């Protein structure tokens, strides 16, 4: 018995690997885990490579204090402009009036061009080549606007007279008659406006009482008869 123990002690001791590490693992399972880890690494790299979106800062709305400050600055600018205009000479005021009026006319003209769909008149009046009624209307509006810029000149009335005459030369007698009728109607309207704008001075004090007699009426009839006779002689 002792001999068997001695022989067993003399024999080599073989250490088996720990089987616990391989429990519940199938063949090739370690390889799958390695592949999974490599995929996760690649996904992390892609996420790192994606460009970050730059956020556009939102413009804050003006506060009450800022709004009040802007209104105050606008009020100061208007006050400075009024002060500047007050110090101008009559000639400078007239020139400033023309400048403001020209700016207003240019703004009105731009609005008219936008209405007709015209984007630019950089080519001048020569760029127009009207054919339809609407195109002639557009051309006329542009020409009238251009001519009206010089209406403050003392030579403007004579210029318009010569211009109308030179244009009407190309018309027939019937068309000139139509132009004449339109001008006469415009003349009548202008007279009405001028009379309405002209205020007649109101006389002060009581009016004098006049005494009319039958002789006054007879004299009036005789005068009317004499005038009628003279007119008749002139006609004959």
Swiss-Prot record:
This is Eukaryotic translation initiation factor 3 subunit J. The keyword Protein biosynthesis applies. Residues 28-46 have a biased composition (Acidic residues). It comes from the Eukaryota. Component of the eukaryotic translation initiation factor 3 (eIF-3) complex, which is involved in protein synthesis of a specialized repertoire of mRNAs and, together with other initiation factors, stimulates binding of mRNA and methionyl-tRNAi to the 40S ribosome. The eIF-3 complex specifically targets and initiates translation of a subset of mRNAs involved in cell proliferation. Coiled coil: none annotated. InterPro entries: eIF3-like_dom_sf, eIF3j. It comes from Drosophila willistoni. HAMAP family: eIF3j. Residues 20-88 are annotated as: Disordered. It is found in: Cytoplasm. The gene is eIF3j.
């Amino acid at each position: 018995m002792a001999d068997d123990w001695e022989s067993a002690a003399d024999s080599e001791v073989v250490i088996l690997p720990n089987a616990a590490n391989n429990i519940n693992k199938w063949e090739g399972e370690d390889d799958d885990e390695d592949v999974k880890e490599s995929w996760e690494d690649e996904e992390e790299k892609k996420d790192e490579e994606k460009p970050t979106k730059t956020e556009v800062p939102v413009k804050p709305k003006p506060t009450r204090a800022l709004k009040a400050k802007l209104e105050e600055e606008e009020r100061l600018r208007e006050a400075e402009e009024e002060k500047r205009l007050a110090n101008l000479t009559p000639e400078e005021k007239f020139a400033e009036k023309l400048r403001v009026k020209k700016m207003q006319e240019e703004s009105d003209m731009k609005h008219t061009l936008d209405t007709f769909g015209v984007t630019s008149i950089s080519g001048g009046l020569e760029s127009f080549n009207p054919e339809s009624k609407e195109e002639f209307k557009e051309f006329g509006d542009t020409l009238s606007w251009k001519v009206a810029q010089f209406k403050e000149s003392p030579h403007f009335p004579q210029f318009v007279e010569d211009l109308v005459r030179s244009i009407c030369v190309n018309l027939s007698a019937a068309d000139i008659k139509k132009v004449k009728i339109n001008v006469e109607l415009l003349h009548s309207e202008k007279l009405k406006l001028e009379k309405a704008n002209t205020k007649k001075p109101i006389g002060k004090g009581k009016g004098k009482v006049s005494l009319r007699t039958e002789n006054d009426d007879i004299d009036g009839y005789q005068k009317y008869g004499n005038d009628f006779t003279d007119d008749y002689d002139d006609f004959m």
